[in-house]
Amino acid sequence: GGKIVSVCTDGHRLAKYVSNISCNDDLSIIIPRKAILEINRILTYFSSNSDILISYSYNNKNFIIQINDFRIISKLIEGNYPDFNKVIPESTSAEITVDKKTFKTSLNIISKVVNQQYKGVKLTPQKDTMHLISSNTDTEIGEDQIDVKYDGEDISIGFNISYLQDVIEVIDGDSIHICINDQNSGCLLKGNNDPNSVFVIMPM
C-alpha cells in the first residue's frame, strides 16, 4: 500500500490530490507543467481502468509514466518544492455550503461583465443566501443572489472569478464547501463527494 500526494500551485491558488496506490519507494519529484499537460491529454485516450506504471530514474533525473504499452519520459525540475502545507489552512472559522450547479451558473452570468484585467467577484454570504457582485471599467455591474448555508460572521471577500470557475469544473460532488477565516487568508474549497481533493484560493 501507499499513496501519491500531487500538488500544484502558481502562488495565487493551490490544488492537492491524494491517490491510494501500490508503491515501493519514498520520493519527492517536481514534474514540469508541460509534461503534466501532455500526460493529461494522453490519458483521455485510455479507459479509467488502464494500468499506469510510474517510475523514476535517479541517474538521469527522468520521470517515466507507462500506460499500457504507451510510455512518456520527461526531465524533472531540480530543487525543492515550496512547503505547500503552510498554504493549506489547518482550521477555518466559517463555512459556506453551496450547490455546485447553482454556483457555476451564477459565476457564468456574472463573468459576462467582469473586469477582464482583474476578474474580481465579491462574495457576501449570510445565513441562507449569498450575494455575488462584479463590475468593469464601463460601469457595468453584474450581481446575483443564491441560496447557501453559512455559519460565520458577516464578511465580504473577493476572488478571481476564473479561479473559482476552474475549481468548479474539476471538483467532485453536488455541493461545494467554501471554508474561510478572514478577507486576507487563503480560502479552502472541498467537494462533498471528493475527500481526496483540496483546493486553496487566495483572496484579492
Regions found by a protein language model. Name each.
Residues 1-18, 22-77, 92-204:
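DNA polymerase processivity clamps
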Residues 80:
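Glycine-rich, pocket-lining loop/helix-strand segments that form or immediately flank
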